[in-house]
Amino acid sequence: MFIPKKTKYKKDFKGRISGNAKGGYTLSFGSHGLKALEPSRLTSKQIESARRSISRTLKRVGKVWIRAFCHTSVSKKPMDVRMGKGKGSVEMWVCKVKPGKILFEIGGVPLNLAREALNKAQAKLPMKCKFVSDEL
């Protein structure tokens, strides 16, 4: 899935997601895209689920670019373990998404098919998103 090959540190701080996206807020590769409207943490499973729904809708037509990648690890302690004794092991990888970030791009597809595919992908994501296009 979407996991970094190598990181400098194994475990990250939780941190906060504040402000708007400083980069990645315009369409770069395709002509249609899905833009985040609120801050959230995307897991690698959610990104993969959205990608699958897009590719099923497009049926081998056009190309899909994924603009979000999971860089942040989330740790969790096992059930029935008392507090203390260090930080838990890495449970999953997430991508911190700020408002305005383009998550997915599609190229070589008609407008109505791209809108349908990205609306299905939006249902798999934990935040509000909107459809953006060069043609509009």
Swiss-Prot record:
Keywords of this entry: Ribonucleoprotein, Ribosomal protein, RNA-binding, rRNA-binding, tRNA-binding
UniProt entry tagged with the keyword Kinase: no
Provide one Gene Ontology biological process annotation: translation
Which sequence ranges form a coiled-coil region, renumbered to this chain?
A: none
Pfam families found in the cross-reference section: Ribosomal_L16
A GO cellular component entry from the record: cytosolic large ribosomal subunit
List membrane-spanning regions. Answer: none
GO MF term list: rRNA binding; structural constituent of ribosome; tRNA binding
InterPro entries in the record, alphabetically? Ribosomal_uL16, Ribosomal_uL16_bact-type, Ribosomal_uL16_CS, Ribosomal_uL16_dom, Ribosomal_uL16_sf
Physiological role: Binds 23S rRNA and is also seen to make contacts with the A and possibly P site tRNAs.
Matches recorded under HAMAP family: Ribosomal_uL16
Family in the record: Belongs to the universal ribosomal protein uL16 family.
Quaternary state and partners of this protein? Part of the 50S ribosomal subunit.
Indicate what this protein is called per its UniProt record. Answer: Large ribosomal subunit protein uL16
Species whose genome carries this gene: Ehrlichia chaffeensis (strain ATCC CRL-10679 / Arkansas)
Give the lineage.
Bacteria, Pseudomonadati, Pseudomonadota, Alphaproteobacteria, Rickettsiales
Q: Which gene encodes it?
A: rplP
